[in-house]
């Protein structure tokens, strides 16, 4: 379905995968993008079929897509402008058989990305940290455990964004309607993708 929809869609694609947190992050990113763009489609495993939304899209549209490992197995041309892998833990091994195969399939989300594209990754996941260090595209890490020189991180109950030239407070955790470290990670991933 993803490949068929992508062939018929227009505009930029922001795609999210991971073992946990996909639906929350997709919803958060969809709401963020609706503040900036008029034509936003939130699709995928979240309940809105990508194939139904694709014919309505224009070049100005933004698609926020939740993508499962099953869907990633069949991609060919699918090219997100921004991708995210939230985490990788043992799951669906009945289908993928080994953890190595599951990791390989999740990493396919970056298959067609170029140096002009971005992948957002969880720095606290050692698999993703190693993967990100070897990617030939722009990588933006997020962390709930440590301050990052570049990326998004949680410190003093505030979510921060930092790069070589600036440090910006994104929001206070008390201002969010969701709680828990895992949800703060979802917020950081969504903010990084936006």
What are these regions (language model features)?
Residues 1-123, 127-138, 153:
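Phosphate-binding loop of NTP-binding sites
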Residues 98-100, 137-194:
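Adenine nucleotide phosphate-binding catalytic loops in nucleotide-utilizing enzymes
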